[in-house]
């Protein structure tokens, strides 16, 4: 067996995604994923609504996660872990400034039912945060094209946990329930 697996690895992974374009400015969608790998079954569901026009956009989403682990013992039941996240993304453009923000509340039973959510970030970056436990995540991204040569992007994000008073461990341990991150990018075109 491989590391952290119960048996030889075989998997069954299915994904169904549906998008309904109700109008030019409104889209509704859903995605469900079922994955069975080496005695562990993971089910994820996301429902969302996108609303946008020329000046602003909004995306509301709700995510659900269920993780089932089979027991190695015949007479024992496996474990089930559940979680969900409610998330809102908003953004607007005004002259040379583009602002976007996100706010999400998450509540999962443990790391097995963690939720992954995309968060806007800097140029050439993809950010999919992984959230477990109970808490909120909020972030603000500001992008400004000062002139034709200078672009400045800044992102400030915070995660507040309600179920713990320490984050991480070892040399990366934070003695508190809040974790902040700040990223700044400056691009100069010749």
Predicted regions and their residues:
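Exposed, low-structure sequence patches enriched in small/polar residues
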Residues: 1-190
């Amino acid at each position: 067996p491989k590391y952290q697996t119960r048996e030889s690895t075989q998997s069954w992974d299915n994904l169904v995604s549906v998008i309904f374009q109700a109008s030019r400015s409104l889209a509704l969608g859903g995605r469900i994923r079922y994955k069975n790998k080496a005695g562990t079954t993971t089910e994820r569901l996301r429902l969302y609504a996108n609303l946008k026009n020329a000046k602003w956009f909004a995306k509301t989403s709700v995510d659900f996660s269920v993780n089932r682990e089979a027991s190695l013992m015949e007479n024992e039941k496996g474990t089930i872990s559940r979680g969900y996240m409610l998330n809102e993304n908003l953004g607007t453009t005004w002259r040379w400034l583009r602002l976007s923000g996100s706010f999400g509340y998450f509540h999962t039973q443990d790391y097995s039912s963690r939720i992954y959510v995309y968060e806007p970030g800097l140029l050439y970056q993809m950010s999919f945060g992984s959230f477990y436990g109970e808490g909120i995540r909020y972030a603000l991204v500001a992008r400004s094209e000062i002139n034709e040569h200078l672009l400045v992007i800044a992102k400030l994000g915070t995660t507040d946990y309600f179920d713990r008073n320490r984050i991480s461990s070892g040399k990366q341990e934070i003695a508190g329930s809040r974790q902040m991150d700040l990223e700044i990018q400056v691009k100069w075109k010749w």
